[in-house]
UniProtKB/Swiss-Prot annotation:
Subunit structure, as described in the record: Homodimer.
Protein name: Type III pantothenate kinase
GO BP, sorted A to Z: coenzyme A biosynthetic process
Binding site for K(+): D122
Organism encoding this protein: Synechocystis sp. (strain ATCC 27184 / PCC 6803 / Kazusa)
Amino acid sequence: METSKPGCGLALDNDKQKPWLGLMIGNSRLHWAYCSGNAPLQTWVTDYNPKSAQLPVLLGKVPLMLASVVPEQTEVWRVYQPKILTLKNLPLVNLYPSFGIDRALAGLGTGLTYGFPCLVVDGGTALTITGFDQDKKLVGGAILPGLGLQLATLGDRLAALPKLEMDQLTELPDRWALDTPSAIFSGVVYGVLGALQSYLQDWQKLFPGAAMVITGGDGKILHGFLKEHSPNLSVAWDDNLIFLGMAAIHHGDRPIC
């Protein structure tokens, strides 16, 4: 990640690059990307009320593509006249009305980058598992509380338990814990890994050899834990799937790779 202000120093005059901004409004944070053509060049995350230094210098000067799972936050950014994506904009089949636009974009980005059929695991505030077949048809999926949400909920709702933070979780915990914080980490992490292993193995039976990719804020640590916990599962990690999905819409659903 560059330390300069997002969007600084990137060429605007090359017609092939055509810069644009992507904004994914998630359940707890704003996810930004500075894109040139169909490639995310810089990505960063802010809270819902970002400081001016965190905003891209090109905001309002180049096209802004926006997707959101928080309607009231969408209204904040209408002043920049964004192209607001909905499920109707995506070339995917069998989506139900309440299906999350973030899941759909990640699925599209996964399929066009790694090939359909594909399974995408998004490790965010909510952890989602979503599968599409070779015809870009939604097979189905699941939603569970993410790692951070589980840790926070145990600390908030149970007086005898400490509230633990994700930054304390730096390595795969011991399964058989001998203190309360370690027991919480063990239960949360191995519970999530067990669920993921079950879904991924079932997906392999349904679609042998199909792509399986992890993304999201907790995606990198989940990917590392899963490799250690279930080394026989072939799962990629890609932090840009949602923005690759946006790029596909921006460029008319052309293959990314």
